[in-house]
Every structure is written in structure tokens, then in C-alpha cells.
Amino acid sequence: MKAYKLLRIKNGKLYPLFIHRKFETPMNIWMRAECYPTKGFAVRKGWHCCFIPYAPHLNMVLSNGEQRVWAECEIKEWDTYNRPESQGGAWILAQKIKIIRTLQMEEVEKMLLKYA
């Protein structure tokens, strides 16, 4: 199934936002979720993704210069996890993920117009 994941981009490489954040996330390779308990975060094993590239509670560019990018992914073995609309609604917790490509912001904006 197709899903969308928000990642950090640094020196042209992709990394998770918060959990296991130093892990370089390769493209076009199936990866299995592992559990990395992290202080300040609930333990939810799985790659956190969205049905659409929408996470209104997260900024795309941080004051420290960190930049984020949406990626189109393929996922397997997934469940949904309900969150408030202020956090984008239902999240996906996938046990397997393959990052297909990154999206340009214009592409994201066009996709979101379909769901507005």
C-alpha cells in the first residue's frame, strides 16, 4: 500500500524525525521496523506514516535550520493508530517500509487540495 512519511533531510540523506534519528534511511530497500524506546515518546513499534502527506503539528523547517521532506513509501503489515485531527488524524504503523521517492512541496500542496 502507498503511504507518506515525513523525514529529515541532511546533506542529501534521509533520517527519521525523532526515534532512532541518526539512522540513515535508504531509498528503494525494504526495511523492517524495530523498537527503539526513546525518552519523552510513547513506545509504538512501527514506521509512523500517513495516508496523505499531512501532519499539521510538525513544521517543515525548524529554527535550527533542520529541513523536512515528505516521502512516498510502500508499506506492508500495517495498522492504524487514531490521533486527533490536530495531529493529522489516523496514523499508520507499518512493520515494513520502502521509501520510493521524496516529494516536492508543490506536489504535496496539490495532493492536499484534493482532500480539502
Per-range role (PLM):
Residues 1-44, 60-68, 75, 79:
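ADP-ribose/NAD+-binding catalytic cleft of ART/PARP-like enzymes
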Residues 11, 54, 78-80, 99, ...:
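Generic "edge-of-domain/loop-turn" microfeature
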Residues 16, 50, 92-93:
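Intrinsically disordered, low-complexity, compositionally biased regions/tails
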Residues 41-49, 53-57:
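Catalytic toxin/effector domains delivered as secreted proteins or via bacterial secretion systems
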Residues 56-59, 109:
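Generic detector of well-ordered alpha-helical segments enriched in charged/polar residues
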Residues 62-100:
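Charge-dense polyanion-binding interfaces
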Residues 92-116:
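Active-site or metal-binding loop neighborhoods of secreted/extracellular toxin and effector enzymes
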